[in-house]
Amino acid sequence: MDSVTRFAMAQREVGLAIGEPPAQKGYTPSVFAELPRLMERTGLSDVGSITAFYTVLVDGDDFNEPIADAVRGILDGHIVLSRELAHKNHYPAIDISNSVSRLMNDICEIEHKAAASQARDIIATFKEAEDLINIGAYERGSNIKIDKSIEYIDKVNSYLKQGVNEKSSFEDNINNLKNM
């Protein structure tokens, strides 16, 4: 399958052709009925498991458009790619602040979750204060959390970048995250 978005657009055309009324942004009700059936084919069963990576193309970076919103409600997590990060030559251009895993609590050790939470907090705090920092309006010492984010944001961003030919093991990544 090319993308969930194109699947939804094709299903919308089928729905409209058989007389279904358009609902959210022109998508017919059958689109939203088919999405869970399509996506829930993957996962764990008594004879094995299937892992899938679905892509959703969003119009104008609107992550609340109907298909993206429906898919987020169905899947156990989502990875958001950011044009802004790509423009900064930050690859992979994964937007950690907007990406979510509902399974992380079930599959990660306590120290791993704590380190990941700290990194997410540094990113979120820096992002909130970035405009003030960039124009020189933020005065160091006025907010401990922002000071910490300024101190660690380059380390976090460096950790999140990976060269095309760079290799690292899962264990190395976790240790580097914990030691940051």
Explain the meaning of each model-derived region.
Residues 1-180:
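P-loop NTPase catalytic core
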